[in-house]
Amino acid sequence: MAGRSKKKGTSGAAKNYITRTRAVKKLQISLPDFRRLCIFKGIYPREPRNKKKVSKGSTAQTTFYYTKDIQYLLHEPLLAKFREHKSVAKKIGRALGRGEAGDAARLEKNLMPKVKLDHIIKERYPTFVDALRDLDDALSMLFLFANLPSSDHIPAKTIALCQRLTREFEHYVITSHALRKSFLSIKGIYYQATIQGQDILWLVPYRFVQRTGGDIDFRIMGTFVEFYTTLLGFVNYRLYTSVGLVYPPKFNAKSDEQGGELAAFQLEGKANATNGASNDHDDDVEINPEAQAKADKIAAMADDEDEQEVEMAEADAEDDDEEENTEGIDKFEPTAPDADILPQPQASSAEIASLFAPFTFYLAREVPRASLEFILKAFGCKRVGWDSILGDGAFTTNESDPNITHQIVDRPPLANGASAAGAEDAATPQVQWPHSTKPGRTYVQPQWVWDCINQGKLLRPDLYAPGAELPPHLSPWVKPKKGEYDPNLPLAAQQPDGEAEAFEDLADEDEDAFEVDDDEDMDAVADREGSVEVGEGMDVADSDDDDEDDSESDAEGGADGFAGFDDESEAESDISEGEAARLQHQRELEAEATGKKLDVKAPTKKEQNAAIRKKFDKKKRAEEEERDRQKMMLSNKKRKLLKRIEYGENKRDTESENLRRKRTRLEKAKAAAERA
């Protein structure tokens, strides 16, 4: 018995997906409202595996959604708000058409519905951890809008809201010492904080003048900002209440107008808020003598207990001195050079959180004040000062304050003679910036702060002195793998066997070529002075022939004149080595017969490097041959997989080799400049 035939497009993939046009008709809303609703609800387009089946044979470009998602939107309360908004907009349009501007303003003020997203936040994030996991994009978007200028597309009210929410979040990070890492990149400054076990990473743009292009759809971005501001408001409230702070914190509008930023917010504990009236008159309160006597008695009992605890602690310390101290953090070291790198246990986060606690910083006018203030305070520093021109809220605005221990500057050192142009004696050493350094004060560049927090310790400040060549600023989230180039390690520890000698010979060849070019240029200058008809250092007539010769030589021998390893070249090398050994033995016999001493020439550096390279090239060829023999035992599928793996490894090795070669050139140039 044949089964019942099904109508095409009523089951399977065609039923699981729905086009955007059909979805808009089904919800009976406009396309902008549909986009806005999908952003609020977290519904995004889907890509079916077989578009032809879903679109019933059509190949036109179409946007698809899950049918269940659109069915889920049918019960959304915001649909009624959108329809009500549309109805009020029609009434306002008719009032404006009649010229009744007052009635239109009254209708907009009284009848325009207010869209609230509280229920959507609760639906999308059932737990607080879910909200923290989705906070990365929210913070990046809000920090971006907080630094944008107001325009027709971005109202100043939205920018002020983003600034308030982001600074409230920064205050929580400072109070809880949740900041872990930061990185200066081309896009902006990356921050990573750990809140309730969740790593949150966001991007803050640099404070340059932002120019918004005309190809940006601010309606879509504004919808995201509307949702993210609601989300961050919920998160800030939960975070503040979890540490016993009142939300929202007090806001000083006057300080904010003067550029106070973080200083414009005053945090307040719940106990202080409830007892604020009584705290204002603490001096007028009379002390109860009976209560004071009981408090003194309890304090005396606590002192006796403390003395006993101190004696017991001293006895325990004497016993511990006799034994080996095993309370330190264990370090897991690999047993073999090719073993896996084990994650090491870290020190207490409390020590890192108070990294800058004992110091007083002063920020120069040219450094990024907002980011440095946030980082320094997040890592325990309570005293950060800057020039009064940078804004309100500084610990001190006096650069000569004796309490300052560190000054962060980012000015290039003045060249000799620039600071004293009217000096009579040119041989006298000139004063460089800073003209008057304060004794006992450390001058560093801003990168010192970022590198210290990323490594979790205070680094040497002399490496970051003003005008010094800074160490490489590396991303704290990217760890170099085996075989990759690591700027922190010395070059000799990363180069494979024989590579240093090869680089040295190539550098010598480059220097020789450079000297030849210099000689040709000098000849051209001399010829130019004597005659105009000379080719000015260029071989004009023979250029075509040279190009042909070069192309032929490149085609025959490759870019470096290397034609590969074959049996004939190996045989020639063996014959030459045997002939050289025979001639050397013959000279030794002749010297022994005549009674003369054989003059042994010491090999040159180039010959030594060539011998070392030859040795390791031979070893490398043997390894490649063994690898090829092992490949022959693999199946075709595994051989293709191995080929893809080798392609990635070769690409990584080539990039690492280029970086090592570049570093070798830079180090040689630096050494030559120092010698000069």
From Swiss-Prot:
Coiled coil: 298-327, 568-676
Cell compartments where the protein resides: Nucleus, Nucleolus; Nucleus, Nucleoplasm
BP term (GO), one: maturation of LSU-rRNA from tricistronic rRNA transcript (SSU-rRNA, 5.8S rRNA, LSU-rRNA)
Region (Disordered): 298-338, 413-439, 478-502, 515-676
Compositionally biased tracts (Acidic residues): 302-327, 515-524, 539-557, 565-577
Keyword list, A-Z: Coiled coil, Nucleus, Ribosome biogenesis, rRNA processing
Classification via InterPro entries: BRCT_dom (IPR001357), BRCT_dom_sf (IPR036420), PES (IPR010613)
Primary site of residence: nucleus
Gene3D superfamilies found in the cross-reference section: BRCT domain (3.40.50.10190)
Residue ranges, compositional bias (Basic and acidic residues): 579-608, 620-631, 643-659, 666-676
Biased composition (Low complexity): 415-427
SUPFAM superfamilies: BRCT domain
One GO CC term on file: PeBoW complex
Organism superkingdom: Eukaryota
Gene Ontology MF terms: ribonucleoprotein complex binding; RNA binding
Domain BRCT: residue ranges: 351-466
Quaternary organization: Component of the NOP7 complex, composed of ERB1, NOP7 and YTM1. The complex is held together by ERB1, which interacts with NOP7 via its N-terminal domain and with YTM1 via a high-affinity interaction between the seven-bladed beta-propeller domains of the 2 proteins. The NOP7 complex associates with the 66S pre-ribosome.
Family according to the record: Belongs to the pescadillo family.
Role this protein plays: Component of the NOP7 complex, which is required for maturation of the 25S and 5.8S ribosomal RNAs and formation of the 60S ribosome.
Protein name: Pescadillo homolog
Organism name: Phaeosphaeria nodorum (strain SN15 / ATCC MYA-4574 / FGSC 10173) (Glume blotch fungus)
Lineage of source species: Eukaryota, Fungi, Dikarya, Ascomycota, Pezizomycotina
